[in-house]
């Protein structure tokens, strides 16, 4: 019996790295897991839709339950559909873990607007989109929920990462507001 038996988790950026590790551990602990990942490289370029499915295959091979999702978390409506898909497929959603991210590192004087926007969109807007749609479900269901948002010590100012630092610091602020706002609904 695992600590997450009967729970349903959605993990963004779950195709590789930290997100993959979290998805696999949550499944090992008994959660059904929605594995969200575009399958892009670290810079957010290209796409391999098989990346999310490969993690689901690992989960299922170990006896767990998984569902692959390759929608971009930067797309508000697609994230809403992803949350609904989790609920339709597994009957509910209990946990959201926002890990997805990309890097476009440059010194501020070398960074263009597109590099700024791409990183902020994935990290900050993507976290907002997922939290927004999941929190509506948590509020309406009235059984609580968990939202886990990943930030980084780079939020405090890492040279060559003005976009990343701003996005990660924004996630800290968003998370504080969510904690203060959603506690009354049992969401922590």
Can you annotate each of these PLM segments?
Residues 2-34:
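Canonical Rossmann dinucleotide-binding motif of NAD(H)/NADP(H)-dependent dehydrogenases/reductases
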Residues 131-132, 176:
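A short, exposed helix-loop element centered on a Lys and neighboring polar residues
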Residues 139-140, 146-184:
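Catalytic loop of short-chain dehydrogenase/reductase
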Residues 26, 65, 91-94, 182-188:
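Conserved Rossmann-fold SDR core element
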Residues 49, 70-83, 113:
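The beta1-alpha1 cofactor-binding region of Rossmann-like NAD(H)/NADP(H)-dependent oxidoreductases
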Residues 59, 107-108, 112-120:
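Substrate-binding pocket helix/loop in short-chain dehydrogenase/reductase
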Residues 29-53:
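Conserved glycine-rich Rossmann-like NAD(P)H-binding loop of the short-chain dehydrogenase/reductase
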